[in-house]
């Protein structure tokens, strides 16, 4: 959505410390598409960053959007888009040992998890677990606010950092 400042002109947006934001990506889909929203949304985010734009995942600190939402769909998440006053601040990350398990240590799994630690999350949490077992990587997240979106973001980072796909059961 281009040139629409009202989305970030609410109390919650000021709580999120947004100023002069008038462009955003509204990710709309079925309720059960949250993980896909995170995965493909992060692919968009990194592409925008490569173009010199700043982005921010916004789960709850925005107002009403002008996104077109079809029947059976909902607004899953918003990504603020524009030129920031700075390049942002590094977020605190959990240690790799807190968000992963491996039956054998491999260089590619470690690289993937290092990329996961750099991944943003929609509500600044890392409530997911990656596991390497029998040469197969799985990842899961508990129920909670935006945990499936965060899992999708983290999965994209893992695959980009490790060069390996995550398998789902």
Question: In which residue ranges do the predicted regions lie?
Answer:
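Acidic, surface-exposed loops and disordered segments
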Residues: 1-169
């Amino acid at each position: 959505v281009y040139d629409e400042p009202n989305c970030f002109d609410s109390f919650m947006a000021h709580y999120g410390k947004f100023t002069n934001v008038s462009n955003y990506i509204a990710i709309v889909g079925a309720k059960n598409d949250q993980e896909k929203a995170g995965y493909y949304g992060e692919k968009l985010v990194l592409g925008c960053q490569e173009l010199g734009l700043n982005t921010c995942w916004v789960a709850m600190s925005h107002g009403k959007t002008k996104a077109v939402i079809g029947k059976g769909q909902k607004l899953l998440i918003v990504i603020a888009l524009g030129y920031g006053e700075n390049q942002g601040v590094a977020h605190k990350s959990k240690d790799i040992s807190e968000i992963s398990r491996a039956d054998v240590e491999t260089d590619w799994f470690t690289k993937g998890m290092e990329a996961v630690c750099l991944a943003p999350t929609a509500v600044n949490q890392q409530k997911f677990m990656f596991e390497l077992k029998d040469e197969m990587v799985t990842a899961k997240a508990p129920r909670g606010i935006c945990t499936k979106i965060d899992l999708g973001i983290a999965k994209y980072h893992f695959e980009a950092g490790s060069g390996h796909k995550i398998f789902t059961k």
